[in-house]
């Protein structure tokens, strides 16, 4: 079970959900976004049982990068951010916020999770700057 959870970083799921919010009708897009944020919450909860370590490591421009590193603190932050993001998506749907606002919020949460699960400085700086842009 852990291999499935660690093969896909949660920020990839949220970035895809941001595009789905824009592409799908309002109700379906927000449902996809709620499921994506709920996935990040559940993933962090389930990885708390022995899922720590560097999971998605590769080389980028000659540098070793770890795109998905899990430790106990990042799991705690992943649970908190996943829960709050799910509540925010449901609130955005309930208040009839424009879909582009929800999409930008998902990109911001996605980059936040990227900083939380960053395993090296290059990954951290990339996602931190992405947070600043969104």
Feature annotation, model-predicted:
Residues 103-134:
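Alpha-helical multi-pass transmembrane bundles of energy-transducing inner-membrane proteins
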Residues 1-103:
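Transmembrane helix-loop-helix hairpins at membrane boundaries of multipass inner-membrane proteins
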């Amino acid at each position: 079970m852990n291999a499935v959870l660690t093969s896909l970083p949660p920020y990839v799921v949220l970035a895809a959900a941001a595009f789905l919010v824009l592409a799908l009708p309002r109700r379906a897009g927000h449902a996809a976004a709620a499921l994506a944020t709920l996935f990040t919450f559940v993933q962090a909860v389930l990885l708390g049982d022995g899922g720590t370590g560097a999971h998605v490591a590769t080389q980028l421009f000659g540098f070793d990068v770890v795109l998905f590193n899990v430790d106990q603190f990042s799991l705690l932050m992943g649970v908190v951010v996943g829960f709050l993001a799910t509540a925010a998506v449901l609130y955005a749907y309930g208040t009839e916020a424009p879909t582009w606002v929800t999409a930008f919020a998902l990109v911001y949460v996605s980059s936040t999770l990227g900083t939380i699960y960053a395993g090296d400085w290059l990954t951290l700086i990339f996602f931190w700057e992405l947070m600043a842009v969104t």
